[in-house]
């Protein structure tokens, strides 16, 4: 498995937004990038039960408005909005916590732009790990999507898991985490606090924290 880490991560624009939601402090991480395809094809890759496992994870459920979904070994939830081929939103329920994803597609010249926003209420895990908790995972997913759209070849999940433990894979986690640290600082967070959280998250994704530490993306 070969990924040009610097190139792939450099294609993504990242931001962090802090705000109040239903009287609680919340934060949204946003990733946006272009893909070498059209909106209809990108929409199908993101929403087809047959195609999602080819670049992300096996999925079960009813993939339509109001339907429930479950990603194997990961999040599940309910689809709360769906306007093909431009927009969908869903709850993201994982590790006992609920957050929210919002995905928008737009044509841009001969390409398709994907914008993904993941919103969570700020709780202990956010204060411990920061935006990289979900941001690194989404960087990995968007890289997998690029590879699939470019070649049509499905991700071999065993190979991908082995790659994540390789020096190149660990380098991806580190560089992604540093991008998220910078986005966190740009949102107005104290740089020292942002670095402490990103260092912790990078260590987790690199497999350098005790195994009993909960996944930083759970939010619980």
Model-derived segments and spans:
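Short beta-edge strand/loop motif at the mouth of beta-sheet-based domains
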Residues: 22-24, 28-31, 37-41, 49-87
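Short acidic, glycine/tyrosine-flanked loop/strand segments centered on an H-E-D-like triad
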Residues: 107-123
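Terminal "cap-and-tail" regions of soluble proteins that handle hydrophobic small molecules
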Residues: 1-23, 119-220
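Active-site-adjacent structural patch at catalytic or cofactor/ligand-binding sites
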Residues: 97-103, 117-119
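Hydrophobic/aromatic beta-strand elements that line small-molecule binding cavities or substrate pockets
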Residues: 33, 77-79, 100-107
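Hydrophobic pocket/interface hotspot
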Residues: 42-43, 52, 79, 88-90, ...
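Short strand-connecting beta-turns/loops that link adjacent beta-strands
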Residues: 84, 95-97, 108-111
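Hydrophobic alpha-helical segments that drive targeting, anchoring, or assembly
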Residues: 35, 75-78, 92-94, 117
């Amino acid at each position: 498995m070969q990924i040009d880490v610097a190139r792939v991560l450099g294609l993504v624009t990242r931001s962090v937004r802090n705000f109040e939601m239903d009287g609680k402090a919340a934060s949204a991480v946003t990733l946006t990038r272009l893909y070498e395809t059209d909106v209809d094809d990108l929409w199908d890759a993101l929403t087809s039960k047959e195609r999602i496992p080819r670049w992300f994870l096996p999925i079960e459920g009813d993939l339509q408005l109001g339907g429930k979904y479950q990603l194997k070994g990961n999040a599940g939830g309910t689809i709360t909005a769906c306007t093909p081929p431009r927009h969908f939103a869903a709850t993201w329920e994982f590790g006992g916590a609920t957050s929210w994803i919002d995905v928008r597609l737009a044509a841009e010249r001969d390409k398709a732009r994907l914008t993904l926003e993941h919103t969570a209420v700020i709780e202990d895990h956010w204060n411990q790990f920061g935006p990289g908790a979900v941001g690194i995972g989404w960087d990995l997913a968007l890289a997998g999507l690029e590879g699939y759209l470019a070649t049509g070849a499905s991700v071999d999940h065993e190979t991908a898991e082995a790659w994540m433990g390789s020096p190149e894979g660990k380098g991806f986690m580190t560089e992604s985490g540093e991008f998220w640290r910078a986005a966190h600082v740009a949102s107005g967070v104290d740089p020292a606090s942002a670095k402490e959280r990103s260092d912790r998250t990078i260590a987790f994704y690199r497999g350098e924290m005790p195994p009993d530490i909960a996944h930083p993306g759970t939010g619980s």
